[in-house]
């Protein structure tokens, strides 16, 4: 079996997923796609175009960590590459990344360099969110001291974005996989924190570059996305800091975004986003992506019940069944 198992999760991003898999052709890796109850024919398209890719076709919608946990538990590689469907690369560099991890046995997570489609670098590694980093963010208005990605050398970082993240299975076996109480956002930060406490390292690895196209799944629902992002951050603060520390972090972060909204008040779109971030940093109000998935699952359950009542059901396909 290959050393690397690729865990891809997809929700209604058929074309992005197919482009990602196209760029993975020839990679020496086990590739597993979990389709998160898509309605755009994603699973069928993957089966048709990539017969060597294993597909787990899920009938309900779950969160980022829960979905990747399903794939991690179903794969066998010594390393698991957690990957967004909205990524591509001209050179995934699995051999280089595996060689680096083999040579550095206490490194549990390796995050490659991320760039936008136009080549601009994307911040992909940061310091852990804490009262101290929140205070620094307030003083500098978010301009300094938190991002750790960048440069040409491999370096230790606090946490790296799970849009593309190579994980050592041995370390996951020790500390556990993603905490499924995080629906989406901050689950990789929490995992990196648990790894650090157990003596493992996370590193930024700029010798592999991944293009992050940023999925449009949440396009049109920016408020829900922002709500979910801050819900994850509040859970992280509450899990890893005292109640007082979590409150200080929330207030400093909210004040930072409020100040940025005031400074650029004439830019209505920007100021509006900053005010929304400020509100949610202090305390999330309103539904997020979790509720969107729950509503969809509830609606599908009601439709299935109606079909059963009228005798129009068919046996559902099991996860991974061709």
Give each language-model segment a name.
Residues 129-158:
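Short, flexible, basic/aromatic active-site loop/helix in glycosyltransferases
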Residues 58-75:
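Glycine-rich, basic loop-to-helix element that forms the pyrophosphate-binding segment
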Residues 12-26:
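Short, well-formed alpha-helical segments that are part of the catalytic scaffolds
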Residues 158-209:
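A short, conserved alpha-helix in the catalytic core of glycosyltransferases
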Residues 224-232, 238, 243-322:
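Non-catalytic, C-terminal membrane-associated alpha-helical segments of glycosyltransferases
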Residues 23, 35-44, 60, 90:
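A conserved acidic beta->alpha catalytic loop
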Residues 80:
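Short aromatic/hydrophobic "clamp" motif used to bind/position activated sugar donors
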Residues 88-123:
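Conserved donor NDP-sugar-binding/catalytic core segment of glycosyltransferases
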């Amino acid at each position: 079996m290959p050393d690397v198992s690729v865990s891809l999760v997809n929700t209604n991003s058929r074309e992005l997923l197919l482009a990602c898999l196209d760029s993975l052709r020839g990679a020496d890796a086990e590739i597993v796609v979990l389709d998160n109850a898509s309605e755009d024919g994603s699973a069928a398209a993957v089966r048709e175009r990539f017969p060597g890719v294993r597909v787990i076709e899920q009938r309900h919608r779950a969160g980022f960590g829960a979905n990747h946990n399903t794939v991690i538990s179903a794969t066998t590689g010594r390393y698991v590459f957690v990957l967004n469907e909205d990524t591509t690369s001209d050179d995934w560099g699995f051999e280089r990344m595996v060689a680096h991890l083999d040579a550095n046995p206490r490194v549990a997570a390796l995050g490659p360099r991320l760039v936008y489609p136009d080549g601009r670098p994307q911040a992909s590694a940061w310091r852990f969110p804490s009262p101290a980093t929140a205070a620094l963010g307030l003083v500098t208005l978010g301009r300094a001291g938190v991002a750790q990605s960048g440069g040409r050398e491999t370096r230790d970082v606090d946490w790296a974005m799970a849009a593309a993240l190579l994980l050592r299975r041995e370390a996951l076996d020790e500390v556990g996989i993603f905490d499924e109480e995080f629906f989406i956002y901050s689950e990789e930060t929490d995992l990196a924190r648990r790894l650090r406490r157990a003596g493992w390292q996370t590193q930024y690895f700029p010798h592999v570059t991944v293009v992050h196209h940023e999925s449009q799944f949440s396009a049109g629902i920016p408020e829900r996305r922002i709500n979910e992002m801050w819900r994850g951050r509040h859970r992280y603060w509450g899990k890893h800091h005292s109640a007082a520390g979590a409150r200080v972090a929330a207030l400093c972060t909210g004040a930072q975004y409020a100040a940025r909204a005031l400074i650029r008040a004439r830019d209505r779109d920007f100021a509006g986003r900053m005010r929304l971030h400020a509100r949610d940093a202090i305390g999330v109000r309103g539904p997020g992506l979790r509720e969107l998935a729950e509503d969809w699952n509830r609606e599908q359950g009601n439709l299935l019940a109606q079909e059963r009542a009228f005798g129009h059901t068919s046996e559902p396909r099991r996860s991974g069944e061709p």
